[in-house]
From Swiss-Prot:
Pfam families: DNA_pol3_a_NI (PF14480), DNA_pol3_a_NII (PF11490), DNA_pol3_alpha (PF07733), DNA_pol3_finger (PF17657), HHH_6 (PF14579), PHP (PF02811), RNase_T (PF00929), tRNA_anti-codon (PF01336). This is DNA polymerase III PolC-type. The keyword Hydrolase applies. It catalyses: DNA(n) + a 2'-deoxyribonucleoside 5'-triphosphate = DNA(n+1) + diphosphate. One of its GO terms (biological process) is DNA-templated DNA replication. It is an enzyme of class 2 (transferase). Required for replicative DNA synthesis. This DNA polymerase also exhibits 3' to 5' exonuclease activity. The lineage of its organism: Bacteria, Bacillati, Bacillota, Bacilli, Bacillales.
Length: 1444
């Protein structure tokens, strides 16, 4: 055989190892000579096709195992398939039939009926290559021939079969008669059921019992139709493959929906699962009583359903049409133990992508079982603490707050048994052991080899096999290459060890991962009665990690390859030892050169310094807060692990844990904890030493450790029991309580599938994918006692019940979140806010304030100062003031504009007083507080009667209550819209005000969304070669959603910690999304959890202030001087007249394209219907467009039916309170009605009666009942104010408007169309519009930009090409009646490159395209684009050198 052929065979064996089939010896005759002939990779479609040359066609079972294994192994890389090429293509009927189910199974996904037909029969085989199947009729035959025959033949071909032909024959008469009888029986039964239903309905009508939709509530178990007998056969949903005429199923309802049909009947649709699969159940109401009964069917009920299974063309899946539905008792797990345990190791969905059951469901289960306490121990995080605390209160449970931490030792030693030996002069015994496993206690050495090295030269060798006294496992043979024949008859361990000890003498021992090799050597020495080795030891693994921390990994084969050291056969001791020797000498020399290390006892001098924490291997430990001090220390440790010691995962150095141990209890955690590992690998003595550090010892049920047995880290269940018994003995010897914990990741055994899907979604990156996931559901006391029965009844009860409650009793009752609001304190804030407010009021309204002004100020200041909110106003004032001084307007959001104090302290421009005139000269004022005017901006122009100065017009008529509540005690939520350009400056300014240690970005937690979960489920279905029904997909998706995926930060939220406390009083701290290079740290808790405890400033970035600033810079016009009632501007909202174009020119009947809040198609349609002419009407429209069920099906109908006009409808939440007060309702009731309506809760009878009594129109009352959400008027007014200012420029300074729009708001351009004029733009718009829903997001964004470009062109302006010497990096420039686009408008040219071009041209003209590419850092693709667009005319391709 050639070397190339051998390589192909080796590749096949490597493939078998990669897919986990290296130990499958049953099929050795088929695989031993198999080769990978070629691999065809399609990068575009991400598919790999393996062409395998084999002696003969594989058995079907082997083909299936390989197919599944490959799909699983390469799921994150590509879709895989095999093309088998056998030397011998002999086939027979048995082989054809063996493969049949594999071949036709995929057909079931496309046609369940045909799939079932094919699956339920065996094809016959006719020579030479014909297969024959049976069908019922011509339709089935045609369907198979047209849709599936070619695929069946193709699939056989891929499995290595010769080209087959396929025939079909009709079932014989007896078979056909049987089929017809089935269909006839079904038809008769359906007719019988229909007749029975008619009789029942007639009987009800005769007895006058035809119920109404308001039927009496359910008093017993739910039942529609007939009673289903207890002994009726139940079919598993997982066994329903095709249409069935009459079956009974049962399951849990997990979704319900009732739809009212045009016919007046109701359609009940719900989904049930019995955890083998799920199904949609449908039922039509027969009368009003059925319709009323439908309302009683709830999610969470268990039901038994009888009916027929049909193929539903609408959902394209099998569904059941129910005839009878009976509620039944659900399946519940009970805890019948007299004394209950407490679970101390439990994960919530905050354990990232690893746990699925909600905190509420887990805590409810504990309470239902009668447990008194429960712990939370998520991986490294405390993010479930707030929810856990609430659930504990809800269910009466004591909550133990903890984490499962990644603990590390402070630097791992490079050297052991330190001795003052000169490294360059020493003799080294470099050795390696090959073993039967990883445990020095339970496994044995089978090969021991070493070399002696002096001055970099090998001077002696030692090599010996050791007979273990038993056959080697397949894993050992495959990993080491050592076979039974090689070790059989070799010297026993005691002989070899004595020889090795004598050979090694007192020389320095060296090994790669010395802790492993020395662990085996020393344990073996002790077993044969020898002392542990006292030699100086060097670990080349840790030395390499220290010297080269930037290497991706430090495995022996990686390092030898890096340094060109020969490693002939990795995992054979003799070859590993020799390679390690040359590596060690290289490392010793580098240690001297890089760190001046010359002696053995200096090797550990740098241990624990710098990035040493990155080199340490983390192990798990559970850390619990015992006291309030401990809770704060836990928060500090979590912060430290995320900020100072994050590397792949948050890490806690043992030294830091020791420093902050006060108030903490520490447990040994799971199989990844150091105590279990010590017992498994090093034995009792090592485990006892480890146990000294901990407060209690954890053991878990045997199934939790199952992956260790599967991966052969533990030999078998008996060996596992021995380890657990020994751990219990360690507890007895050390006096540490041993507690049985569950390592809970989900509530019930049936929930395991959700975790499997989540873990599978992470592919090879998650080590849990290396073995079958263990059973880690929440176990009852009974279940746990049964799991530990092997310890004896008494000991089992001690560790399950007694000790778990003992640990609970150690813990104080703790509250991880505060009850009160803690705002920062600024000395004199109250006086400053009061003085500012009155100062500005006097400046505007005169020395003697109008009564309405003074009353409003006093009312607000009393609430603001009385409840400690003055500091919040002062901080907001400082932020806004700085922005204004720096030249950027600030827009207010939310309801802050409802506060007159906010207006007077310049936090908002919105004035909430009733509409009024105000003289800027003599301070005279005139108020309209009767509701006759909607906005002061709508008042007609008027001169002051006292001094003749034109009046200013102000006031939006907004009650203060909508901001701070009726009692004025609601925490103010001041949202401010800063320019997007200025936002980082505003954020940084908060650090100046409060100090860096007291401000943090508001943290957020990103969880698995429904769409993402759907992808996970479908990928799992594909990779596991499954067919999952649609309803089952929905269930699995629901089970995977809500699990933490990542963390982030609120776009503008800044959390302020008062300086008389520190952040750990409220929350740990971390970086967003674990980005350790982030400029800001965030709160570890989601900001909603601490929203009511600390001040949150909403410093948001917005385009409007940026646009206003650019317009001001271009025009020199102060935006505050722009009139709010300009007639031409107001016309813009109802026609295109002000633009000088016709509606057909711009495909819009209004001129609001590009105007914030009014440019979308939806709002433009509202404008067309309502034809607003005033500012207050624009505020109405802003409110209507942002609310839910405020416009559609509500105000829209009222206006269309002429019930009322635009000013009269309910637009914003504040309108309700103001209108009702004007109608005569008491203000507190008016406020309650407003709050109820805006939250979608409708009206109570009391509210409705009061409204009717005060002559509130009935249409108004009905409108209130429909509303789900409402916009605050202050928010709407602030938005409209900005919109009107921008609209002013669109009408009167159009090129300023367009230059600003394209610079600030647009991201996607089609410069080719824009430069080529109106027809080109319209053609591109048509292309996008013709795509309809298929248009991409980028194309839809481009369409919006092109609409504005088309309008600009229609108004007589045009676009120039990008100009190499005129264009800006990132702003459109006005040039006469045209705009010059910036460089970053070129596709794929980023702003950084654009700035580079501008910087380069300032250093001189470009000599050539080559010069532009080099100096401007521009890609060839961009150069080509610019050349095609004519931007580089006259520029040669390359620099030219003239010699004369």
């Amino acid at each position: 055989m050639t070397a190339k052929e051998e390589e192909k065979q080796e590749r096949f064996q490597l493939l078998m190892t990669q897919i986990g089939l290296q130990d499958v010896t049953t099929y050795e005759e088929f695989t031993k000579d198999a080769k990978i002939e070629k691999l065809v990779a399609d990068k575009k479609n991400k598919t790999w096709q393996f062409h395998l040359h084999v002696p003969q066609i594989f058995p079907a079972a082997l083909f299936h195992m390989m197919d599944v294994g490959m799909k699983r192994a390469f799921s994150q890389i590509a879709e895989t398939e095999m093309q088998i090429v056998p030397e011998n293509q002999t086939i027979n009927e048995t082989l054809i039939q063996e493969y049949w189910n594999l071949i036709v199974e995929p057909i079931g996904k496309q046609s369940p009926m045909i799939g079932k037909l094919l699956m339920e029969q065996k094809p016959t085989f006719k020579e030479p290559h014909f297969i024959e199947v049976a069908v019922h009729n011509d339709m089935e035959e045609a369907t198979i021939q047209q849709r599936f025959q070619a695929k069946i033949i193709e699939n056989y071909g891929k499995a290595g079969f010769p080209r087959l032909a396929m025939k079909m024959h009709m079932l014989d008469q007896s078979e056909t008669d049987e089929y017809k009888a089935f269909a006839q029986a079904k038809q008769e039964e359906d007719q019988k059921k229909a007749a029975e239903a008619v009789q029942v309905m007639q009987k009800r009508q005769a007895e006058g019992q035809n119920g109404s939709a308001n039927a009496a509530p359910l008093t017993g178990p739910f039942q529609i139709g007939y009673k289903i007998k207890d002994d009726e056969e139940i079919k598993r949903l997982g066994d329903v493959y095709d249409e069935e005429r009459r079956i009974t199923v049962q399951g849990l309802i997990f979704a319900t929906e009732i739809r009212e049909l045009r016919s007046g009947r109701s359609l009940l649709q719900f989904k049930i699962t019995d955890y083998t699969s799920s199904m949609i159940i449908k039922m039509f109401s027969r009368d009003n009583e059925d319709a009323a009964m439908f309302q009683n069917l709830k999610k969470g009920m268990w039901v038994k359903v009888r009916g027929s299974v049909q193929n539903d063309t609408f959902v394209r899946d099998l569904i059941m049409m129910a005839q009878d539905i009976n509620e039944i008792a659900g399946v519940k797990r009970l805890d019948t133990a007299e004394e209950k345990r407490a679970e101390l190791h439990l994960h919530s969905p905050m354990s990232q992508m690893d746990a699925t059951s909600s905190v509420d469901s887990l805590f409810k289960q504990a309470a239902d079982w009668g447990h008194k306490a429960i712990a939370i121990t998520d991986h490294s995080v405390a993010q479930s603490f707030p929810e856990a605390y609430g659930a504990g209160q809800k269910y009466g449970l004591k909550v133990i707050f903890g984490i499962e931490a990644n603990l590390i030792d402070d630097g791992v030693p490079i050297a052991y048994n330190d001795q003052h030996i000169a490294l360059e002069d020493a003799t080294y015994c470099v050795f390696d052991v090959e073993t039967t496993g990883l445990s020095a206690v339970y496994d044995t050495i089978i090969e021991l080899a070493g070399v002696k090295m002096k001055n970099g030269e090998i001077i002696d060798k030692f090599e010996a096999f050791i007979d273990p006294g038993h056959p080697l496992s397949a894993t050992t043979i495959n990993l080491t290459g050592i076979t039974d024949d090689m070790v059989k008859g070799s010297d026993p361990i005691d002989v070899v060890l004595k020889q090795f000890r004598e050979w090694s003498g007192d020389d320095i021992l060296v090994a790669h991962n010395a802790s492993f090799d020395m662990g085996f050597i020393n344990t073996a020495y002790e077993k044969v009665g020898l002392e542990k080795a006292k030699n100086a030891v060097v670990d080349t693994l840790e030395l390499a990690r220290f010297l080269y921390p930037h290497f991706k990994n430090h495995r022996l084969n990686t390092l030898t390859k890096k340094f060109n050291i020969i490693l002939e056969q990795h995992h054979r001791a003799v070859f590993d030892a020799e390679a390690t020797a040359y590596l060690a000498w290289k490392l010793i020399k580098d240690a001297k050169e890089m760190h001046d290390i010359e002696f053995h006892d200096s090797l550990n001098d740098y241990m624990g310094e710098g990035d040493a924490y990155k080199r340490a291997r983390p192990f798990h430990a559970t850390i619990y807060a015992q006291t309030d001090v401990g809770l704060k220390n836990l928060f500090k440790l979590i912060t430290m692990s995320n900020i100072n010691y994050f590397y792949r995962v948050p890490r806690i150095p043992r030294s830091q844990l020791k420093k902050m141990r006060e108030g903490l209890i520490i447990g040994t955690a799971c199989s990844q904890g150091e105590l279990f590992e010590a017992m498994m690998q090093k034995g009792m003595q090592a485990a006892e030493k480890v146990a000294e550090f901990y407060d209690f010892i954890e053991v878990q049920p045997k199934p939790v450790y199952a992956p260790l047995i599967e991966r052969e880290l533990v030999r078998d269940e008996k060996a596992l029991e021995e380890i657990l018994k020994n751990i219990v003995r360690v507890g007895e010897k050390t006096g540490k309580p041993v507690v049985a914990t569950g390592n809970v990741h989900y509530k019930d055994p049936v929930d395991k599938i959700y975790r499997k899907i989540l873990i599978h979604s992470q592919g090879g990156a998650n080590p849990l994918n290396r073995a079958e996931l263990p059973d880690v559901h929440f176990r009852s006391t009974d279940e746990m006692l049964k799991e530990f029965a092997f310890l004896g009844e008494e000991k089992a009860k001690e560790i399950v019940v007694t000790n778990s409650n003992l640990v609970v009793d150690w813990m104080d009752d703790l509250k991880p979140i505060k009850d009160e609001l803690y705002t920062p304190k600024i000395d004199g804030a109250e006086d400053e806010v009061r003085n500012m407010s009155y100062g500005m009021a006097h400046q505007l309204y005169g020395e003697k304030l109008p009564e309405i002004v003074e009353a409003r100020l006093e009312k607000e200041l009393k609430s603001i100062i009385g409840h400690g909110f003055a500091v919040i106003y002062l901080i907001s004032h400082k932020l806004v003031k700085k922005s204004l001084v720096d030249g950027y307007l600030v827009g207010s959001r939310g309801s802050v504009g409802s506060s007159f104090v906010a207006t007077m302290t310049e936090i908002t421009e919105v004035n909430p007083l009733p509409p009024h005139y105000l003289c800027p000269n003599c301070k005279d004022s005139e108020f309209f507080d009767d509701g006759s005017v909607g906005s002061g901006f709508d008042l007609p122009d008027k001169d002051c009667p006292h001094c003749g100065t034109p009046y200013q017009k102000e006031g939006q008529d907004i009650p203060f209550e909508t901001f701070l509540g009726f009692k004025g005690d609601k925490v103010p939520d001041i949202d401010l819209n800063f320019s997007g350009d200025y936002q980082p400056v505003a954020h940084a300014y908060t650090k100046e005000i409060f100090g860096e240690d007291y401000v943090f970005r508001a943290g957020t937690i990103g969880t698995v969304a429904e769409k993402t979960a759907f992808g996970y489920v479908r990928n799992y279905e594909r990779d596991m070669n499954m067919t999952i029904r649609g309803a089952e997909v929905d269930r699995l998706v629901a089970g995977c959603t809500g699990v933490k995926r990542t963390t982030g930060q609120h776009p503008g939220g800044i959390i302020v910690i008062p300086d008389y406390m520190d952040v750990y009083d409220f929350t740990p701290v971390q970086f967003p999304a674990d980005a350790t290079d982030s400029e800001w740290k965030t709160t570890h808790f989601d900001f909603h959890s601490i929203h009511d405890n600390v001040l949150k400033l909403d410093i948001l970035g917005h385009d409007d202030p940026t646009a206003i600033r650019m317009l001001q810079d271009l025009s020199g016009i102060d935006p505050k001087t722009i009139p709010t009632d300009d007639p031409d501007v107001m016309k813009l909202f109802g026609s295109t007249e002000s633009l000088g174009v016709k509606p057909a020119d711009i495909d819009s009947k209004t001129g609001t394209l590009g105007i914030p809040e009014f440019g979308t198609r939806f709002v433009r349609q509202m404008l067309e219907q309502t034809k607003p002419t005033t500012f207050s009407e624009l505020v109405q429209i802003s409110g209507l467009s942002h609310g839910t069920d405020v416009w559609l099906g509500n105000a829209e109908e009222l206006i269309k039916n002429k019930t009322c006009e635009l000013p009269d409808v309910i637009g914003c939440r504040d309108d309700i309170m103001v209108f009702l007060i004007y109608q005569g309702l008491e203000s507190s009731l008016a406020f309650k009605i407003m709050e109820s309506v805006r939250k979608g809760k409708g009206l109570t009878e009391e509210m409705e009666e009061a409204m009717i009594a005060n002559k509130v129109p009935l249409w108004y009352i009905e409108s209130c009942k429909k509303i789900k959400y409402m916009f605050p008027k202050a928010h709407a007014a602030a938005y409209v104010l900005m919109a009107v200012r921008i609209a002013y420029f669109k009408v009167h300074h159009p090129l300023y408007f367009y230059a600003t729009y394209f610079t600030v708001r647009a991201d996607d351009f089609d410069l080719t169309s824009m430069v080529n004029g109106k027809e080109a733009v319209k053609a591109t718009m048509k292309e996008v519009n013709d795509k309809g829903m298929e248009a991409s997001t980028k194309e839809k964004n481009l369409l919006t930009v092109l609409e504005i470009a088309n309008e600009m062109l229609a108004r007589g302006f045009h676009f120039q090409k990008v100009d190499l010497y005129k264009s800006s990096a990132d702003e459109f420039i006005i040039d006469g009646d045209s705009l010059i686009p910036p460089f970053n408008a070129i596709p794929s040219l980023g702003t950084n490159v654009a700035k580079q071009i501008v910087a380069a041209r300032e250093n001189g003209e470009f000599l050539s395209k080559e010069d532009l590419q080099q100096r401007g850092k521009v890609s060839k693709t961009i150069i080509q684009y610019m050349d095609d667009q004519g931007c580089l005319e006259g520029l040669p391709d390359q620099n030219q050198l003239s010699l004369f």
